[in-house]
Amino acid sequence: MNRQRRYGRTLPEALGEYARRNPARFHMPGHKGQDVPYGGRLAGWDVTELDGTDNLSNPEGIIAVCEGAYRDAYGARSSMLLVGGSTSGLLTMSLALGRGRRVLLGRDSHKSALSALALADHEARFLLPEINPAEGLAGMLTPRQVEEALQEQPADAVLLTSPNYYGLCADVEGIADVAHAYGALLLVDAAHGAHFPFSPQLPEFPAKKVDLWCVSVHKTMAAFTQSAVLHVGKHCPMDPERVRRVRNMVQTTSPSYLLMSSLDRALYVATKMGYQRHMDRIEALRERIGRINGLRVLGQDSLGFGAVDMDVTRVVIDVTERGIDGTEAYESLVNSGVVCEMCDAYRVVLITTPQDPDEWYDRLIDGLTHLPYGVSQIHKDPPYIALGRQVCSMGEAMLGPTERIPLAGAVGRVAAVALSLIHISEPTRP
């Protein structure tokens, strides 16, 4: 990527220059770059809108250049930085539709997607993803499912999650064609796929077919937590300025320059370093894991049931043949100095990036080799996802009057929140 920018510097360079000048800071934030726990350069770079640092709400300088670089890298019509993660992107996409629209989405959508529908007072129509019974794992929505649903009842938009937490990817292009044929926009929560444009060995994202999509750069690239980007597709009928205006409504008016700077840097790192060396490392790592007794890495043989491709940098390890469940494997790995992204009943999930030191992979192999053995085979049950009968809108359910009742008395009642059990944090050591 050509870094000879119109304004002659990047966000990190501008912030570094300002910190080196060490002016008397009579502006926000209150720590003034001085005595804060993390100290040093990081505190010095935490500034506000100043001469030379641009303004995220209406960028015309270095932020605009950064957004333009993302636009070009992702093949979008317009790209906008997000400092509230893909949650703020989903809120923006939902509200940009207007209010009271009909939206078709998968039952496995992220909770922030449900919040977005509630806040916009949209009518949600849920579809069940395909189920892979052999893996005990939910697959993805299919073009046929979407078409049948739109034939039954029109919708203003289809909201698709792809890739999912396991790195599985839906037929986004096929679903886009169906949605557009029935007059619906296609919105994609691609939070876990920010890195896809940087290697031909990663799933191809059909940017030309999608209307709006968001990516969580912080999940898989070298950016700070909460750093994300919202993209407007080249053929989206919606005015990008409308999208930006809505983005400004749901995002703080005091955006973190540390987050924006990390977004700028993350794109530079991805384009300069590339992913080829990492793809080679991951191929070798997956082979090493596959040679460990009782372990199996999800691969191309796990596709189908709506999944047409997968992100091989998302290493999903099935531990059931070892006679243990995912939680036992997770906790054992923690004790070996390895912390996974998450686990479920049968697997542990690891997010790998080019920033991983090679030594971590050796430590992982050692931890996996020393996983305990269970006394019996773990049998997989297909996930049960019930649609139920909708009796009110998401907004009425989530924002209406509520009361807390015992679980035994909840039959026939409407849930105000979604409750689930998921192991995504480091367990307390004994």
Each predicted region: which residue ranges?
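A short linear hydrophobic-aromatic micro-motif
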Residues: S78-M80, G337-E341
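Residue-level detector of conserved catalytic or cofactor/ligand-binding positions
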Residues: I422-P430
